[in-house]
Regions:
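Glycine-rich, basic loop-to-helix element that forms the pyrophosphate-binding segment
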Residues: 59-82, 88, 104
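Short, well-formed alpha-helical segments that are part of the catalytic scaffolds
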Residues: 10-24, 350-355
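Short beta-strand-to-loop acidic/aromatic patch adjacent to the donor-nucleotide binding site
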Residues: 84-96
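A conserved acidic beta->alpha catalytic loop
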Residues: 20, 37-46, 62
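Active-site-adjacent helix/loop segment of glycosyltransferases
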Residues: 183, 220, 224-305
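Acidic/His-rich active-site region of diverse nucleotide-sugar glycosyltransferases
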Residues: 69, 95-203
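Non-catalytic, C-terminal membrane-associated alpha-helical segments of glycosyltransferases
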Residues: 270-347, 430-462
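A short, conserved alpha-helix in the catalytic core of glycosyltransferases
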Residues: 178-180, 185-204, 208-236
C-alpha cells in the first residue's frame, strides 16, 4: 500500500501526522510513504529527512496546491508496476490518525468488492470530541456539501487529550445513536481517503482546481465508473476545523471550482443560479467593507466563463495581523472612539486584557459597547452602553443615526453585523487569532459598480 501526503509550509503538522502513523496497527512493512512537498520554505524537507529515513520525498519546484501535489503523487503511483500497490491512502498534511484508522478502511474495501473508496470520519482537532464530517452528499443544484453528523459531539470525550483519543476505542457506531459502522455517501474528503489503486488509475488525475472541490469531483467521477463510495464510523482522523479558518483568498477557488463541478455534473440552471448566488455574496462583501474579498467572487465567475483553471496569482491589499499586536491600534492617539458589538467574544479572542490595559493607559479613549435586546450583559466594565431595540427596522435606524461617530468599529469575522460596518471610519475585523483593519465601505463605490453587477446578473449562465 502507498500513503500519499501533500504538504506546504506545515512542518510541525506533517511531523505530527507521521508520528501518529508510526503508531497505527496496520503492518508497517506493508506500507510505503510518499510525501509531496510543494516547495516549502519552512524547513519541512530537512526536518522530514532528519526524523524519518523510511519515507520517500518528491519536491515540487513551486506550490501546486493540493490538486497539483496529489497529482504528482498519483502520477508516480500510476507509473509503478500494477502489482506493487493494491490501495492508495491519501492524507492531508494537517491531520493526525487513530491507530485503527487505516485498518478499518482496509476492512471496508476487503469486505466489499464494489466499494472503491472508503473515507474516515473527520473529527475536529481544536475540539476533539466534535465530529466535523462523516462523509457527505453533494447537492448538484448548488454545489453544497451535506455533511453527515456535522458538529455532532461525543460528550464522554470532553476533556480527553488527543494523544489518548488516538489509542482509545473509536467505534462511533457504538456510542452514537442510529450510527452504522459504514454507510454509502457521495463524497469523502482526501484528508483521509483510501482508494483501490486500479480504480484510481482508471479514474485518472484530479481536475486542475489547485485547491478545494478537487476531491469532491474525483469522488463523483469515481462513482460514475460504477463503484461505491463509503465512509467508516470506525476509522477516525482529527483535522483542524474549517470553522476556525477565516474566509480569505480561498474564496476565489471555492466559488470558481464549484461552477466547474456543476457545469460537469449538473445542468445550466444550476450553474446560472450559482453564479447569481455568487454575485449576491459579492454584494454582501462590498456592503460589509471587505471589498477585496468581494472582487474574488467576480474574478471566480469571470475565470470560469473564460475556462481559466489552476493556480491564480492573488494579491490582497489588507493583511491579517496577529491578535497580540492589536494593542498598537488601541494605543494610537488618533483613535478616540471605538465601538464593540456583542458578537465578539473578547475572552475567546484573547483581546479582553488588551482592551483593559489600553483603557487604563488612555483615560481619553472611549469604548462603546453595543448591547443586544436579548442579552443586556456587557463583557467589559467602564464601557458606554448602546442599547439596541428589539425591532429589526428600529435597529437599522439606530445604526443609521450612529454613522460617522466612531473611529473604529470592531467586527467579528465569524458573525459580522452588516450595518455596523457603516458607522465608523474603519472596521477592525477580528477572529480568535488574527485581525485586519479595513476602511469603511463607500456607497459611491457600490453605486458605480451596480451596472456591472446587473449586467453579470442577467448574463449568468449564458
Amino acid at each position: 500500500m502507498l500513503i500519499i501526503i501533500v504538504t506546504w509550509n506545515k512542518k510541525d503538522y506533517v511531523l505530527d501526522l507521521l508520528n501518529s502513523l508510526s503508531s497505527i496497527t496496520f503492518p508497517r512493512d506493508q506500507l510505503d510513504i510518499l510525501v509531496i512537498d510543494n516547495a516549502s520554505n519552512d524547513g519541512t524537507v530537512e526536518a522530514l529527512k532528519a526524523q524519518f529515513d523510511d519515507i520517500q520525498i518528491i519536491r515540487n519546484t513551486e506550490n501546486l496546491g493540493g490538486t497539483g501535489g496529489f497529482n504528482t503523487g498519483l502520477t508516480w503511483a500510476y507509473d509503478q508496476a500494477e502489482s506493487r500497490y493494491d490501495y492508495l491512502w491519501l492524507l492531508d498534511n494537517d491531520v493526525v490518525v487513530h491507530q485503527n484508522a487505516l485498518s478499518e478502511l482496509v476492512a471496508v474495501l476487503d469486505a466489499n468488492p464494489d466499494i472503491a473508496v472508503a473515507g474516515s470520519t473527520m473529527m475536529q482537532l481544536d475540539y476533539p470530541w466534535r465530529i466535523n464530517e462523516m462523509g457527505a452528499f453533494v447537492d448538484l443544484q448548488n454545489g453544497n456539501l451535506l455533511f453527515n453528523r456535522h458538529y455532532e459531539e461525543i460528550p464522554s470525550w470532553r476533556g480527553k487529550q488527543i494523544d489518548d483519543l488516538l489509542v482509545d476505542n473509536a467505534d462511533l457506531s457504538q456510542v452514537l445513536m442510529h450510527c452504522q459502522p459504514q454507510m454509502d455517501v457521495e463524497y469523502v474528503a482526501a484528508a483521509s481517503l483510501l482508494i483501490r489503486a486500479p480504480v484510481a488509475k482508471q479514474t485518472g488525475l484530479w481536475m486542475d482546481f489547485f485547491i478545494h472541490f478537487d476531491d469532491v469531483e474525483w469522488c463523483l467521477r469515481t462513482a460514475k465508473t460504477g463503484h461505491r463510495i463509503a465512509v467508516s464510523a470506525k476509522s477516525l482522523i482529527w483535522h483542524l476545523s474549517a470553522a476556525a479558518k477565516v474566509p480569505n483568498w480561498i474564496l476565489y477557488y471555492d466559488n470558481r471550482n464549484v461552477l466547474y463541478l456543476l457545469d460537469k455534473y449538473s445542468d445550466k440552471l444550476a450553474v446560472k443560479n450559482t453564479i447569481r448566488r455568487t454575485l449576491k455574496k459579492y454584494l454582501y462583501y462590498q456592503l460589509i467593507g471587505k471589498t477585496d474579498l468581494a472582487e474574488l467572487h467576480v474574478q471566480a465567475i469571470t475565470d470560469f466563463e473564460q475556462g481559466t483553471m489552476g493556480k491564480k496569482n492573488i494579491q490582497l491589499p489588507y493583511k491579517f495581523e496577529k491578535i497580540a499586536t492589536i494593542s498598537r491600534i488601541l494605543n494610537d492617539p488618533a483613535i478616540k472612539k471605538i465601538v464593540v458589538p456583542w458578537t465578539i467574544n473578547m475572552q475567546a479572542s484573547n483581546i479582553e486584557h488588551i482592551f483593559v490595559s489600553a483603557m487604563k493607559n488612555r483615560p481619553e479613549l472611549e469604548v462603546f459597547y453595543i448591547v443586544p435586546p436579548h442579552n443586556p450583559q456587557r463583557q467589559l466594565t467602564n464601557t458606554i452602553p448602546i442599547l439596541m431595540p428589539r425591532s429589526v427596522l428600529s435597529r437599522y435606524l439606530k445604526y443609521f443615526r450612529l454613522r460617522n461617530k466612531f473611529d473604529i468599529a470592531l467586527q467579528s469575522d465569524y458573525q459580522t453585523i452588516l450595518p455596523l460596518s457603516w458607522i465608523a471610519r474603519e472596521n477592525l475585523f477580528t477572529n480568535d487569532e488574527y485581525f485586519c483593519l479595513r476602511p469603511a465601505p463607500q456607497l459611491s463605490r457600490i453605486i458605480r459598480q451596480l451596472p456591472s453587477f446587473v449586467k453579470k446578473w442577467y448574463q449568468a449562465g449564458k
